[in-house]
Curated annotation (Swiss-Prot):
The keyword Metal-binding does not apply. Pfam families: DsbB. This is Disulfide bond formation protein B. The chain crosses the membrane at residues 14-30, 49-64, 72-89, 145-163. Belongs to the DsbB family. Disulfide bonds join 40-43, 104-130. Residues 31-48, 90-144 are periplasmic. It comes from the Bacteria.
Length: 176
């Protein structure tokens, strides 16, 4: 735990998290533009959750040695990973438990103050079907892989949060 405590206070740990998210976002863009797999509304929302983790990584990388910055990054990471897990579980439900009464929206709905689909349509515009399985790897669909990825983020986060309470002892004159 001491290692994770020390590691979380280094900029490299937060940049490593950012690098992982850049890889996942790059993969998503490759699927969209390279393989011509149209993202659905849930895919876009899951992408935004990934971006939230990227934001958390950037926040934590600012000054990880300061507890307030580190905890802000950890909280943002946790919120984004939980929301991403919720969205991807819901998406798996649309794919494997189809119902005419449970469908995703036809269009992404962002707040008026941040219409990401208008600002960056090549990344945030949805035109796929949430219930359609368009790609699998090792027998898992894309949202199933996202469940694994977001759950993995939460496991890593839990370990790092627990490690925050295991700081290195400092020697005092009374310890000698």
């Amino acid at each position: 735990m001491q290692f994770l405590n020390t590691f979380s206070k280094s900029r490299i740990s937060w940049l490593l998290l950012l690098l992982c998210i850049v890889f996942f976002e790059g993969s998503a863009l490759f699927f969209q533009h390279g393989m011509k797999l149209g993202p659905c509304v849930m895919c876009i929302y899951e992408r935004v959750a990934m971006m939230g983790i990227a934001f958390a990584a950037l926040l934590g990388a600012i000054a990880p040695q300061y507890a307030i910055i580190r905890w802000a990054g950890l909280i943002a990471w946790g919120y984004s990973a939980v929301r991403g897990l919720q969205l991807s579980i819901e998406h798996v439900g649309y794919q494997f438990n189809p119902s005419p009464f449970a469908t995703c929206d036809l269009f992404v709905q962002f707040p008026n103050w941040a219409p990401l689909n208008k600002w960056v349509p090549w990344m945030f515009e949805a035109y796929g079907n949430c219930a359609e399985v368009v790609w699998t790897f090792l027998g898992q669909s894309m949202p199933q892989w996202l469940v694994i990825i977001f759950a993995g983020n939460l496991v890593a986060l839990a370990l790092i949060v627990i490690a925050q309470f295991f700081s290195k002892k400092t020697n005092t004159i009374l310890d000698m």
